[in-house]
Design a protein with these regions (language model features):
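Pyridoxal 5′-phosphate
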Residues: 1-167
Length: 167
């Protein structure tokens, strides 16, 4: 299916086909580094070495420190960790601005934060499914600690100008 010339796959915003080279690397890692990297035995130590090497490579690519990276098992877990962690470690403000068409893995932690007293402002999309960045920016104030906006909507494929929003 991956190399089917008749296939015109148009759902990469939701799930992307894995490139063969990536599948090979994943397969090798799963075969050679299957052990718990926190264990004391030799296979675990090898898994820890591989994990640390991967973490260092990602850190170099992103221009950050290895200790600043957290690997999660999926995007939903990563979203929960990022949103709850960012909000609950802040020492000022309780304002959060979010677009109305975020993934449930973004919506649910924000509902939890709203129940804890955070002020979650939801900005609706325009008729064409894109986000009015000016409305998002207008919702930001001195108490805003977090803005959540997907770059590409995984259901309708619209792209949002997150570069402008982040500037």
């Amino acid at each position: 299916m991956l190399h089917d010339p008749e296939l015109h796959y148009l759902d990469n915003a939701a799930t992307t086909i894995v490139a063969p080279e990536v599948a090979d690397v994943i397969d090798k890692a799963m075969r050679e580094h299957w052990a718990n990297p926190s264990s004391l035995y030799a296979p675990g130590a090898r898994s820890e070495e591989a994990l640390n090497a991967a973490r260092a490579a990602v850190a170099r690519t992103l221009g950050c420190k290895s200790k600043e990276l957290y690997f999660t098992s999926c995007g939903s877990e990563g979203n929960n960790l990022a949103l709850l962690g960012a909000a609950q470690t802040r020492t000022f403000g309780k304002g959060i601005v979010v677009s109305d068409f975020e993934h449930p893995s973004v919506q649910r932690p924000l509902e939890r934060l709203a129940a804890q007293g955070y002020n979650v402002t939801v900005v609706n999309p325009q008729a064409d499914g894109t986000l009015d960045i000016n409305k998002m920016l207008d919702a930001v104030d001195k108490n805003t600690i977090l803005v959540a906006c997907m770059m590409v909507n995984n259901e309708i494929g619209t792209r949002n100008d997150v570069e402008r929003l982040a500037a």
